[in-house]
Amino acid sequence: MSNTHCVLIGAPVDSGKQRRGCLMGPDAYRTANIEQALADLGHTIEDRGNVAPVPHSNTAHPKLHALSETIGWTEALAGAAENGLSDGLPIFMGGDHALSLGTVLGAMRFAASSARPLFVLWLDAHSDFHTPDTTDSGNLHGTPLGYVTGRPGFVGFPQLPYALPQENVAIIGLRSVDAAERAALQDTAIQRVDMREIDETGIARPLSAFLDRVAAAGGMLHVSLDVDFLDPGVAPAVGTTVPGGATIREGHLVMEMLHDSGLMTSLDLVELNPFLDERGRTAQVMVDLAASALGRRVFDRPTRAY
């Protein structure tokens, strides 16, 4: 990946779950100097500020948390993603994972207009494959992959230009999948890599296989990095902590491989809750990972004093 025009877009989405705090995420990334970290790599940086949801009703839903607001965010972020992709490589600073309902939709629209297939790499402890009908929690941050792959039940959400092909999706880092999602995923073509597979064979092999498919298809690649992909021992600032996650080194390897491939066209940084952080530790880790995805090497990465 040569020098890139990075478009920073704040997505202070806090409607996808009931535990508050992710709305502070964009400012935490800015405070952790994400702009300087990427500029130091030779990239040009444009910070477009924070997106706001399109106007929406505040009508309560008997089962789903903040449905109308989340639909408003989806519409707004889809437009921001399309515009960002027109101008460079958009980096969405979240914000909970419901933001990806919009960012992936926007990437799908842009890919369709460019006559290229879109692929999605989901780095997450969870599969986020629920629908509004199957979620027990009512939290819509657990539904983005269900939405973009065309599962039913997303009444009121923007219409998809097409259903993202299952074989174009890889989820890496799985270690918390509930029974309904497991059953729904079982017969899909989605590539699913859980932590046991990573323990047994390493993280490079399945990622390399997926990237080979993206390259062979001439595809665009949207990467969605959830804080809980990482072990909470190194990234505690997330409301959905699940022990046994990826190590710092595994995280950087993934990002370095993405940079080496030259395939990544957009990036989500999601679920950072600064209210739960330790002196900005997790925000800094996520900034370092973003820098690795944009070309920082091991010997360039500064040692952090936490």
Regions found by a protein language model. Name each.
Residues 1-2, 111-115, 137-138, 160-164, ...:
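Solvent-exposed alpha-helices and their adjacent loops that cap or buttress functional pockets
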Residues 122-125, 149, 173-176, 194-196, ...:
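Short, structured patches in soluble enzyme cores that scaffold and shape functional sites
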Residues 88-90, 166-170:
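Short active-site oxyanion
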Residues 2-13, 18-92, 99, 103, ...:
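Catalytic cores of soluble, metal-dependent hydrolases
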Residues 177-186:
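Short, glycine/polar-rich helix-capping loops at beta-to-alpha or helix-loop-helix junctions
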Residues 85, 89-158, 261:
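Active-site histidine-anchored catalytic micro-motif
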Residues 170-178, 247-249:
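A general structural motif
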